[in-house]
């Protein structure tokens, strides 16, 4: 019982043991007798202090990442995206699904479900990632063609076909990649003589950055959104 309740991230196992001793934990309306009590978290109604807990086997979070945070669980060089989450979520062992550069903003998923996270990042599944980008200079249709054909960068990096869609004056665009290489968007843009001045990820697969989610804030994914991720990653 203590392990089940602690997995929600709301309480530590020590706190759960104290709550059980105080008679504040109910399972299907009956007081839990011991931290070692067994229950099926998928079907049992577990309440603490009168509040029914929502059990999630795995946790999935959408974060609108701000600039200045590292996509890591811990890093001595500066604050990480985990610092943007409350303590009860950090207790659940969440980690970022892939990486965004420190100065890149936008959609970042965090989870404690390693298998699905691995599948989403696997080159075998080619999950699209879309970025909004602002550059110094002007992009043209010639750049769109070069992206579509695949770029061979001077540092030896070979990039697969990517979609570049220009916005208005050509200093802004959307880029869709089907692979994930180190600093890829920045390196591709630099190779065309249009260095990136701002970068934001807006989509991963069929999951779009929530337009109502403020920068630096997070929300839980819905059950349907998680199922959609399983489908596009081949995990179903």
Give the ranges of each region predicted by the language model.
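Basic, flexible Lys/Arg- and Gly-enriched helix-loop patches that mediate nucleic-acid binding at interfaces
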Residues: 1-236
């Amino acid at each position: 019982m203590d392990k089940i309740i602690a997995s929600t991230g709301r309480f530590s196992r020590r706190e759960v043991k104290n709550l059980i001793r105080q008679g504040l934990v109910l399972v299907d309306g009956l007081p839990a007798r011991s931290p070692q009590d067994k229950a099926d978290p998928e079907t049992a109604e577990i309440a603490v202090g009168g509040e029914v807990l929502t059990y999630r086997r795995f946790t999935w979070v959408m974060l609108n990442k701000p600039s200045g945070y590292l996509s890591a669980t811990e890093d001595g060089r500066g604050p990480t995206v985990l610092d943007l989450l409350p303590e009860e979520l950090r207790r659940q062992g969440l980690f970022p699904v892939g990486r965004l550069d420190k100065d890149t903003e936008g959609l970042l998923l965090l989870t404690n479900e390693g298998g699905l996270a691995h599948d989403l990042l696997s080159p075998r599944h080619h999950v699209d990632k879309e970025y909004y980008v602002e550059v110094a200079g002007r992009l043209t249709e010639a750049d769109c063609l070069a992206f579509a054909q695949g770029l061979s960068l001077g540092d030896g990096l070979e990039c697969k076909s990517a979609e570049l869609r220009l916005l208005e004056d050509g200093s802004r665009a959307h880029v869709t990649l089907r692979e994930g290489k180190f600093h890829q968007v920045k390196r591709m843009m630099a190779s065309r003589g249009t260095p990136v001045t701002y970068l934001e990820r807006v989509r991963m697969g069929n999951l779009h950055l929530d337009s109502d989610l403020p920068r630096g804030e997070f929300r839980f994914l819905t059950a349907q959104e998680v199922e959609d991720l399983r489908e596009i990653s081949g995990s179903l």
